[in-house]
Amino acid sequence: MLKVRSALSLIQSQKATLSLATQKRWQTNVATAEAREDSEWLQAKPFEQIPRLNMWALSMKMSMPGGKYKNMELMEMFEAMRQDYGDIFFMPGIMGNPPFLSTHNPQDFEVVFRNEGVWPNRPGNYTLLYHREEYRKDFYQGVMGVIPTQGKPWGDFRTVVNPVLMQPKNVRLYYKKMSQVNQEFVQRILELRDPDTLEAPDDFIDTINRWTLESVSVVALDKQLGLLKNSNKESEALKLFHYLDEFFIVSIDLEMKPSPWRYIKTPKLKRLMRALDGIQEVTLAYVDEAIERLDKEAKEGVVRPENEQSVLEKLLKVDRKVATVMAMDMLMAGVDTTSSTFTALLLCLAKNPEKQARLREEVMKVLPNKNSEFTEASMKNVPYLRACIKESQRLHPLIVGNARVLARDAVLSGYRVPAGTYVNIVPLNALTRDEYFPQASEFLPERWLRSPKDSESKCPANELKSTNPFVFLPFGFGPRMCVGKRIVEMELELGTARLIRNFNVEFNYPTENAFRSALINLPNIPLKFKFIDLPN
């Protein structure tokens, strides 16, 4: 009964999701709250003195032929702006995008996160909100999910899905299924690599994407899609694969660059709406398939204890719409992101064979044989594997940064910044500075290990550790931390361990410009990894 009440409350709340105009009014209301009169605030410089970019000059630089920023990747552009305007500057809104403050100063990061409020407002994903709130409102009926929503509707949705997705015991159900996916991934590599050079083909990223989509689908859709097998070339799964790819390719131009899509239905907006329609259609079909399967089991008297019920099954018990929208959010947020993170990790390990060798020593204890099964107990003791993943995320960050709308007045870099201000937190420069990470240019997983003398501590205790914990937050911070964090971590850990147990991995090509910026960083070079077989 409690679950039913929660679902009804959620649906009512989500149906009240803020429209774009309403969100702006909410931000204005927040900006008038809790005026500060303390000494820090009074001694700070006025907000108006923050370096500012002229709207027309910025538009020219970003979009006109010969403009300084026109042909730059997103991360390159933000670094160029930092060099031009300093560690903190104010950017005007262009073509309907809100104006925002951009800070590269790590001292500001904690201040922003500590002033994010009860329901943190994370700007962005306006095209996805448009699709769910306006374009296909008849389907979503106010249930918008976790990605594009703000305020209480977002908080209510997270309250329902958090107990299912963030509980370690629920994620552990997928060890065996993900192990099967990883076995198929290894077999696919054996089939695809050149028999003479042992190198993967130029388009190996396609195989990595198939592996990540297959892995996420095990959780989101309670189903293996068969994407790592040749027999599914024309399947619905392959359609989903291409729709997700299209979503990431097109979104960057509408979300991050000047575009009149809010005023006229541009070709790219129509293209994105078709991709989102496709994701919705295929996901709904798979959810309906799961419902039929569960109904059939119920008629046959099959009853599983709660600790054996899948994530999708538990969400369906809350509400079908909630389960469907959450599945879509997991697919959109969990495929290209994991693929890019995994690619960065493989490149780091391939270019640092001594680190790969140390990792293999640890993995051999978990997987004595190539086909050994993962166990919950053995995967509790893989600190170097987790350290390798973290260090690769530091060297190859997935996104430019994070963003929040201040819920309270704050002082950033010595300036008064009023509540309601959009703030973009950009740690790119700090992630590779010795000031924050000693020997920052090197791949040193050891910086994330706890020293034996400090084994009870939650933080690294050695000379390589970060000097500011708010510089490196790959899964975000606070209530808006990635809801799929545990699933992604398990996917990366199991996939990497299986690959390193089966192969010695080399990459005998340059890695300059290995990634390009879209909504996230995406691989930009042929991933011709060399996979050398290891003895069983």
Swiss-Prot record:
Enzyme class, UniProt record, top EC level: oxidoreductase
- Show the stretches that span the lipid bilayer: none
Q: Please list the tissues where expression of this protein has been recorded.
A: Expression in third-instar larvae is detected in the midgut and Malpighian tubules of both lufenuron-resistant and wild-type strains, higher expression level is seen in lufenuron-resistant strains.
Family matches, as PROSITE patterns: CYTOCHROME_P450
Which Pfam families does UniProt cross-reference here? Answer: p450
- What is the E.C. number? 1.14.-.-
The consequence of D295G is: In strain: Subline 8
Binding-site list for heme? C482
Location in or out of the cell:
Mitochondrion membrane
Q: Which CDD domains match?
A: CYP24A1-like
Give me any GO biological process, just one: response to insecticide
What is the required cofactor set for this protein?
heme
Any one of the GO CC terms: mitochondrial membrane
| Keyword tags | Heme, Iron, Membrane, Metal-binding, Mitochondrion, Monooxygenase, Oxidoreductase, Transit peptide
Q: Which GO terms describe its molecular function?
A: heme binding; iron ion binding; monooxygenase activity; oxidoreductase activity, acting on paired donors, with incorporation or reduction of molecular oxygen
Name the major location: mitochondrion
- Entry's family note: Belongs to the cytochrome P450 family.
What is the documented function of this protein? Has a role in resistance to insecticide lufenuron, but no other insecticides.
Fetch the PANTHER family from UniProt. CYTOCHROME P450 (PTHR24279:SF120)
Miscellaneous field: Bari1 transposable element insertion in the 3' end of the gene leads to ten-fold more abundant expression than in flies lacking the insert.
Record's protein name: Probable cytochrome P450 12a4, mitochondrial
Annotated organism of origin? Drosophila melanogaster
